[in-house]
């Protein structure tokens, strides 16, 4: 069951992309989103990830990490938190690889809207909860 409050960590080096995601989530009226945005992977790793976030939105191309290594590092440090990969079209191969390694989903920047973002977040959290019951 989806919570009425969801805490999200956005790891995105482009402030415009991060702001767009936050604006999309503000359109959702029945869920209170608590959003933390960081620009770099090393900033994200400073948080107590396991206890503090319901989902992570992860850009694969960051100033301090790039490609599938970005996902691998985050997944290693937050194995119990669902990760949704955000990617530009040119990074789609990395995104598909990340899903194969455990990312819940990937979203292509520029193609995502409020409805698809919310659906991905809900599905990722529910999938992780069901997976933890096994």
Regions found by a protein language model. Give the residues of each.
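Acidic, metal-coordinating helix/loop segments flanking the phosphotransfer/catalytic sites
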Residues: 22, 37-55
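Receiver (REC) domain switch/output surface
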Residues: 116-129
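Acidic catalytic/metal-coordinating carboxylates
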Residues: 40, 66-69
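Short amphipathic alpha-helix used as the core "switch/output" element in two-component signaling
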Residues: 27, 46, 68-80, 97
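Two-component/phosphorelay signaling modules centered on CheY-like receiver
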Residues: 3, 15-39
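Active-site residues of response regulator receiver
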Residues: 59, 87
């Amino acid at each position: 069951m989806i919570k009425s409050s969801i805490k999200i960590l956005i790891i995105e080096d482009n402030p415009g992309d991060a702001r767009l995601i936050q604006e999309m989530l503000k359109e959702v009226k029945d869920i209170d989103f608590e959003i933390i945005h960081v620009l770099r992977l090393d900033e994200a790793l400073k948080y107590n990830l396991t206890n503090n976030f319901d989902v992570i939105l992860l850009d694969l191309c960051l100033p301090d990490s790039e490609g599938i290594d970005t996902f691998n590092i985050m997944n290693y440090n937050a194995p119990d938190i669902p990760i949704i990969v955000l990617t530009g079209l040119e990074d789609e191969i990395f995104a598909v690889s990340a899903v194969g390694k455990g990312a819940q989903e990937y979203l292509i920047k520029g193609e995502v809207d409020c409805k698809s973002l919310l659906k991905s977040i809900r599905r990722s959290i529910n999938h992780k909860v069901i997976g933890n019951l096994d």
